[in-house]
Amino acid sequence: MGDWSFLGEFLEEVHKHSTVIGKVWLTVLFIFRMLVLGTAAESSWGDEQADFLCDTMQPGCENVCYDQAFPISHIRYWVLQVIFVSTPSLVYLGHAVHMVRVQEKRKLLREAERAKEARAAGSYEYPVAEKTELSCWEEVNGRIALQGSLLNTYVCSILIRTTMEVAFIVGQYLLYGVFLDTLHVCRRSPCPHPVNCYVSRPTEKNVFIVFMLAVAGLSLFLSLAELYHLGWKKIRQRYVKSQPGVGECQLPGPSAGRVQSCTPPPDFNQCLENGPGGKFFSPFSNKMASQQNTDNLSTEQVRSQEQIQREGFIHIRYAQKPEVPNEGSPGPSLPHGYQSDKRRLSKASSKARSDDLSV
């Protein structure tokens, strides 16, 4: 047996991006397969061919009978089983690492673009709530919820390893059956007659065979349970999304069926609206303020012009000669800007009084 540390490091990374059932499956793979194969099982099959004895002296007959009894050694067969079963998980790990790096690069690019725009604008941008993109997983309470392409890869890896598990269980049954026989009768050439061959430590080997078959069955059950868990979770999410009114805030009362709108207080005259790209912006932008200032300025100019015209008209009327009420000669002209007394004289005061001032 070689060193399993290289494969173990990879599977530890897979453990971080797996579901609860997937973590149990990896624990079974580590403890009940790799650890057993690396310690106890290898020692039981170490002297397999050396202690395989046959009651014949025919050259080559013993080797032929051993090949018939064990087409492939159990220990090597189980090593192949572990490699083929864990390969889909390694492929999934490669995809997960790739997606992590891609999302980190996208995040760095977004931050660089935002900093560049801030420097170009010359103003500080307050941190705003951005619209989150659909990622391949979500960390909720320290757990990773798979979704998107990463979820599809994970499901495919489970399907492949389930198929591999079934194939190796069926293959082991077809090659060896369930138990090893103590006596093996060989009838192959060049043996001249049926030869009796004896397997070393058959009971110990049968214990390991049954144990490995049970672990393979447990691994298969966990894979099927994980598929069921993911499928049921996906169906439940689609069912919840298909329900009308899910996610709407409804208040108890007669208007419970209506969606309550957010109404600002009376003195709240500037509402922040959600703009494109998930950023918050004010509806009273600089462009609207500039247009309003221009309109106000034009209105003030029109008013000032009207007032100037009105004042000029009054000065012109006052500068004209006053009309003489009788047919006498016109009196002396009034100086410019002089405003005569236009108070109406009564009939009783038509005669000249001694106290009247002469002009």
UniProtKB/Swiss-Prot annotation:
Annotated stretches, region: Disordered: 285-305, 317-359
Subcellular location, principal: membrane
Disulfide bonds: none
Residue intervals annotated with topology Extracellular: 41-76, 187-206
Transmembrane stretches, start-end: 20-40, 77-97, 166-186, 207-227
Gene3D superfamilies (UniProt xref): Gap junction channel protein cysteine-rich domain
Repeat keyword on record: no
Positions on the Cytoplasmic side per record topology: 1-19, 98-165, 228-359
Entry annotated with the keyword RNA-binding: no
Record GO terms (molecular function): gap junction channel activity involved in atrial cardiac muscle cell-AV node cell electrical coupling
GO biological processes: atrial cardiac muscle cell to AV node cell communication by electrical coupling; cell-cell signaling; heart development
Membrane topology: Multi-pass membrane protein
GO cellular component assignments: connexin complex
Record family assignment: Belongs to the connexin family. Alpha-type (group II) subfamily.
Function according to Swiss-Prot or TrEMBL: One gap junction consists of a cluster of closely packed pairs of transmembrane channels, the connexons, through which materials of low MW diffuse from one cell to a neighboring cell.
Subunit organization: A connexon is composed of a hexamer of connexins.
Protein name (database record): Gap junction alpha-5 protein
Protein species of origin: Bos taurus
